[in-house]
Curated annotation (Swiss-Prot):
<keyword id="KW-0624">Polysaccharide degradation</keyword>
<dbReference type="GO" id="GO:0008843">
    <property type="term" value="F:endochitinase activity"/>
</dbReference>
<keyword id="KW-0119">Carbohydrate metabolism</keyword>
<dbReference type="GO" id="GO:0000272">
    <property type="term" value="P:polysaccharide catabolic process"/>
</dbReference>
<dbReference type="InterPro" id="IPR000726">
    <property type="entry name" value="Glyco_hydro_19_cat"/>
</dbReference>
<feature type="disulfide bond">
    <location>
        <begin position="46"/>
        <end position="108"/>
    </location>
</feature>
<keyword id="KW-0146">Chitin degradation</keyword>
<comment type="similarity">
    <text>Belongs to the glycosyl hydrolase 19 family. Chitinase class II subfamily.</text>
</comment>
<keyword id="KW-0732">Signal</keyword>
<feature type="disulfide bond">
    <location>
        <begin position="227"/>
        <end position="259"/>
    </location>
</feature>
<dbReference type="GO" id="GO:0016998">
    <property type="term" value="P:cell wall macromolecule catabolic process"/>
</dbReference>
<dbReference type="InterPro" id="IPR016283">
    <property type="entry name" value="Glyco_hydro_19"/>
</dbReference>
<keyword id="KW-0326">Glycosidase</keyword>
<feature type="signal peptide">
    <location>
        <begin position="1"/>
        <end position="23"/>
    </location>
</feature>
<feature type="active site" description="Proton donor">
    <location>
        <position position="90"/>
    </location>
</feature>
<feature type="disulfide bond">
    <location>
        <begin position="120"/>
        <end position="128"/>
    </location>
</feature>
<keyword id="KW-0378">Hydrolase</keyword>
């Protein structure tokens, strides 16, 4: 990944919603709001110009019951805001003095720039296909064969043989990102479980400062690099996207937005 190496060492099942799941993400975020959030994604300077569409997002979300449809209206809005914020950080083309602000430039990239590795780890379960490279692609910048394999199995596509689909088919790209979001990586909970209020931190979690909120989602995604050492500009960037998107959706941010004092998950 560009700023993140997602490492999923344990293949987990998709975390399905507990309780009431209803409707569609289209009832939570409209096309106009989506376009406002990702204001410059189709700018001529963006590598991903024309790739990430609202229709692809809605279609991908429909494949994961519970995503953006669990709990209260506010909980649903926060989940969509959190997902788009985290993935916006992974694909950002923004800078401090960018037009409309740094947080209007999410989804500018669809694949890792200047990848120097094939991200292939020898695996009997998820063997690399000859000549294929598993660098960061899509909204979450999915990396490594041991992520492409289980993600592909979950969505019914052979991504080990066809990793480029994550960056050439927007619905596939969104599906891999939502798969990652919905899937627990023990001892990490799923990001969905956290934002939907389904995760109860253990004593060890609390001792490590890991409590429910947007901050622990950053810890799940890239805690080993960004969390537990005080102020970090990457964490602040994620929070900036999240606050902007919550404001657009008209929902409060909740508590515990950063992971500055959280120890990373083991």
């Amino acid at each position: 990944m560009r700023s993140l190496a997602v490492v999923v060492a344990v293949v987990a099942t998709v975390a399905m919603a507990i309780g009431t799941a209803r409707g569609s993400v289209s009832s939570i975020v409209s096309r106009a709001q989506f376009d406002r959030m990702l204001l410059h994604r189709n700018d001529g300077a963006c590598q991903a110009k024309g790739f990430y569409t609202y229709d692809a997002f809605v279609a991908a979300a429909a494949a994961f019951p519970g995503f953006g449809t669990t709990g209260s209206a506010d909980a649903q809005k926060r989940e969509v805001a959190a997902f788009l914020a985290q993935t916006s950080h992974e694909t950002t083309g923004g800078w401090a003095t960018a037009p409309d602000g740094a947080f209007a430039w999410g989804y500018c990239f669809k694949q890792e720039r200047g990848a120097s590795s094939d991200y292939c780890t020898p695996s009997a379960q998820w063997p690399c296909a000859p000549g294929k490279r598993y660098y960061g692609r899509g909204p979450i910048q999915l990396s490594h064969n041991y992520n492409y394999g289980p993600a592909g199995r979950a969505i019914g596509v052979d991504l080990l043989a066809n990793p480029d689909l994550v960056a050439t088919d927007a619905t596939v790209g969104f599906k891999t990102a939502i798969w990652f979001w919905m899937t627990a990586q023990p001892p990490k909970p799923s990001s969905h479980a956290v934002i939907a209020g389904q995760w109860s931190p253990s004593g060890a979690d609390r001792a490590a400062g890991r409590v429910p909120g947007f901050g622990v989602i950053t810890n799940i995604i890239n805690g080993g690099i960004e969390c537990g050492h005080g102020q970090d500009s990457r964490v602040a960037d994620r929070i900036g996207f999240y606050k902007r998107y919550c404001d657009i959706l008209g929902v409060g941010y909740g508590n515990n937005l950063d992971c500055y004092s959280q120890r990373p998950f083991a």
